[in-house]
């Protein structure tokens, strides 16, 4: 979600007076995590907004449903560099046609993509068997 806060450093919004600075808020079902994946996701969203709206977004928030609390995230140079580094790695893998192997872990059950997860799908057998099963599901 993106909130817009009135700011002299903001951008003009159609139908609104004044200048408004985008403030990305990423909602998460569970609680805060020790790894930085949520912060990187928020930063990637902010980078996209910055490019689309020609502005600089200094911070955003993560809202965790478990404690029902927002956590402020400063989008500093270190986080931006980490996010851009991961993006470069992703693009390199895509260009090579390479999908990195991933192991299932305890956080997988809370993931919104668990039903289409590559580690889980790869345990079901070959691509041919998977496609055959999906086609069979759609057949009358």
Task: Describe the function of each predicted region.
Residues 1-32, 44-47, 111:
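Conserved catalytic cores of phosphodiester-cleaving nucleases, focusing on short active-site segments
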Residues 38-51:
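Short, charged, amphipathic alpha-helix that recurs within catalytic cores of restriction-modification
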Residues 50-140:
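Metal-dependent nuclease catalytic regions and adjoining charged, substrate-binding loops involved
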Residues 32-33, 70:
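Short, solvent-exposed loop/turn segments at secondary-structure junctions
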Residues 22-24, 39, 70-72:
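Well-ordered beta-strand positions in beta-sheet-rich domains
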Residues 33-41, 75:
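Short alpha-helix boundary/capping segments
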């Amino acid at each position: 979600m993106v909130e817009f806060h009135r700011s002299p450093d903001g951008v003009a919004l159609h139908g609104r007076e004044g200048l408004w600075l985008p403030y990305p808020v990423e909602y998460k079902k569970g609680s805060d995590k020790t790894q930085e994946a949520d912060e990187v996701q928020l930063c990637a969203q902010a980078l996209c907004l910055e490019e689309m709206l020609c502005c600089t977004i200094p911070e955003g928030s993560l809202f965790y449903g478990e404690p029902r609390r927002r956590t402020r995230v400063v989008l500093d140079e270190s986080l931006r560099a980490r996010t851009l580094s991961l993006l470069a790695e992703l693009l390199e893998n895509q260009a090579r046609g390479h999908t990195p192997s991933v192991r299932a872990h305890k956080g997988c059950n809370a993931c919104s993509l668990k039903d289409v997860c590559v580690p889980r799908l790869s345990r079901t057998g070959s691509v041919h068997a998977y496609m055959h099963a999906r086609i069979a599901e759609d057949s009358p």
